[in-house]
Regions:
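Gram-negative (and chloroplast) outer-membrane scaffold detector with strong preference
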Residues: 34, 46-122, 143, 147, ...
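An anionic, turn-rich surface loop/hairpin at beta-sheet edges
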Residues: 124-138
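Outer-membrane beta-barrel "beta-signal"
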Residues: 25-27, 160-171
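Conserved active-site loop/cleft motifs that coordinate metal ions or position small ligands
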Residues: 147-153
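Cleavable N-terminal export/targeting peptides
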Residues: 1-25
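Short N-terminal segments immediately surrounding and downstream of signal-peptide cleavage
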Residues: 21-37
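Solvent-exposed loop/turn segments connecting transmembrane beta-strands
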Residues: 36-44, 129-131, 153-165
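Residue-level preference for beta-strand/loop junctions
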Residues: 5, 44-46, 87-89, 105, ...
Length: 171
């Protein structure tokens, strides 16, 4: 009985220690664009991302470095609102303010500024690629310290701005 109690106590303490927020974390996940214009969802596809996260100690702030590949619809007005497939590689450092509501749920809001390498129909680095500055306000929630659900609006060159919804796993 003592061994069973000691094992239970050890597992409980170790799970509590593991649940504490780590200083450095890595997140991987998928994104999906939401079109905000007419015909804005015809060429949307699932993308993926990786985040490096640094949680400042004794502070509600965290810093992220995001690398993402997105495939989404570009509606260009000069071509009678015809939808095209846009592809982007985004490098986005950001700062978030975390609102811990409980040990299981934490909301956050933040903003990032970085670079978006954009192209249409041919992949990212083929002929026609363009580099644009990107600013991205973001909202999200971390659930059970490992699941991240987020919304991010990438504000960039007129035809390439987009709303991205994401879900990821924090390691």
């Amino acid at each position: 009985m003592k061994k069973l109690f000691a094992t239970f106590l050890l597992l409980t303490i170790s799970s509590l220690a593991f649940a504490q927020k780590k200083t450095v974390q890595v997140e991987a996940g998928i994104t999906y664009p939401i079109g905000l214009k007419k015909n804005g969802n015809k060429e949307n596809h699932i993308g993926f991302y990786a985040n490096g996260i640094y949680n400042f100690t004794n502070s509600p702030l965290s810093a992220k470095l995001r690398l993402s590949y997105d495939s989404y619809t570009v509606v260009m007005n000069e071509y009678s609102n015809s939808p095209f497939n846009g592809r982007s590689l985004v490098i986005l450092p950001s700062v978030n303010y975390n609102f811990p509501t409980s040990s299981k749920v934490e909301f956050y809001a933040g903003v990032g500024a970085g670079v978006s390498i954009d192209n249409m129909d041919r992949g990212v680095f083929n002929n026609g690629k363009k580099c644009h500055a990107v600013c991205a306000p973001q909202l999200g929630v971390n659930i059970i310290n490992h699941i991240n659900i987020s919304a991010q609006y990438n504000i960039t060159q007129k035809d390439f701005s987009r709303l991205m919804l994401g879900i990821g796993y924090i390691f």
